[in-house]
């Protein structure tokens, strides 16, 4: 799936507004799941529990299985894809990062996408 930089930036901007709402307002668990479903672009299972705050840079390349618990202050940098399979617990303050920048300064603006984490 090849996306133009402009399209990626539009999705990031939309998701930043959703994340700001998610992390600064009071929400019940079902509202948290609904907002995160909007951020990732697909419905997540009712068995997924995510403690706030939660952060992602892009959101659309995150996939959640079932029976997942994500503790507070977790960051997912997901342009390269992140798959959280069934029965996973993620501790507080964890970072899942699936993208990097080129080391060569001449190519540094390019992104280096890896297989899903």
Residue ranges and their predicted role:
Residues 54-64, 69-117:
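Flexible, glycine/small-residue-enriched loop-and-beta-strand segment within the central core
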Residues 1-47:
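Terminal amphipathic alpha-helical/low-complexity segments used for targeting or macromolecular assembly
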């Amino acid at each position: 799936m090849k996306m133009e930089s402009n399209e990626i930036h539009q999705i990031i901007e939309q998701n930043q507004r959703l994340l700001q709402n998610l992390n600064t307002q009071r929400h019940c668990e079902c509202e948290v799941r609904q907002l995160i479903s909007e951020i990732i672009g697909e419905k997540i299972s009712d068995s997924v529990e995510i403690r706030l705050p939660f952060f992602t840079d892009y959101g659309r390349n995150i996939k959640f299985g079932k029976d997942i618990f994500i503790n507070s202050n977790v960051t997912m940098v997901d342009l390269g894809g992140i798959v959280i399979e069934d029965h996973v617990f993620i501790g507080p303050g964890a970072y899942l990062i699936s993208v990097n920048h080129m080391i060569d300064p001449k190519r540094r603006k390019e992104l280096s996408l890896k297989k899903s984490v």
